[in-house]
Amino acid sequence: MSKVFIENISSDSKVKLSSLKKLAQEILKDFEEKGDLNIILVSDSFMRRLNQRFTSRKGTTDVLSFSFKEEKNAKAKGSLLGEVYISVNRARKQARDYQATFDQELKRLVAHGILHLLGYEHKTKKDLEKMRKKEEEYIG
């Protein structure tokens, strides 16, 4: 079974880590993924630096996923599947914009980040629709 580690290095102490961990474990189990996962909750300023360094994009973003699997479609074999970084500031703003709760938006971002690690992309409208549908299966 995959292990999920969650760390909140943002200044927001109102994050319910247990519900995020449970969701992540459910997704990994459904995909029969054996690799472990790190989820790191960060501030916008931290995310801005990550985004610039690893994607060469300026500004912040809501979620970044980094796969540690050797091959794109390979299953991690008891090793680290990857890391998902989530901007808590972005999650709060998007929750207001989407008329969702903060917890719902964090769960959506966790699902979104993990789905990227599992091979989902959203380069086309069709891909985005497929990914959104899968996210909804988990966050309802």
Where are these regions (language model features)?
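An acidic/histidine-cluster motif and surrounding catalytic segment
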Residues: 1-107, 117-140
